[in-house]
Amino acid sequence: MIDDIYNKAILELAGNIPRLGRLPDPDASATAHSKLCGSTVTVDVKMDGDVITDFAHDVKACALGTASSAIMARHVIGAKADEVRKVREIMRKMLKENGPPPEGRFADARYLEPVRDYKARHASTMLTFDAVVQAVDTIEAKRGAAQAQVAGAANVG
């Protein structure tokens, strides 16, 4: 039943979403949008090395998109780049391939497990995970380009 996906835990998460707003100086921002439901999540991320040190988000989403964003916001600080990539893949498999929910830092995502039976809700549930990985990828790409530029300048001199 659809009541399963809008359970008490989901509604409590959606109603208590931390870290709302935007960072004044993010290392990268990314936006993910669901064409199906119109939900949009924009994230701002700061990193030190491969660790996320600050995070904020602007969430215009249904209860499921908001709940998944709340889970991300509660647990992303201190996460490593590979960790957020891994949790995105675990979430995708949980929803689309009947895989197990995440464990560890992002274990609260287990509350989203009933969403797997409602394909139309998968995209909004994945928005925050996709946006965070996109922002991390952007940060790493910028760093790689900067390192290549420095290496190129050193070879010229």
Q: Model regions: which residues?
A:
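A short glycine/serine-rich beta->alpha loop
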Residues: 30, 54-61, 112-121
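Structured beta-strand/loop patches that form or line metal/cofactor-binding pockets in enzymes
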Residues: 13-59
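A short glycine-/small-residue-rich loop at the edge of a beta-strand within enzyme catalytic domains
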Residues: 1, 32, 59, 63, ...
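Alpha-helical support elements that line or immediately flank enzyme active sites
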Residues: 68-80
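Alpha-helix initiation and capping sites
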Residues: 4, 8, 35-39, 62, ...
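Catalytic-loop motifs flanking and including active-site residues across diverse enzymes
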Residues: 64-69, 124-127
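C-terminal binding/interaction regions
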Residues: 1-21, 79-157
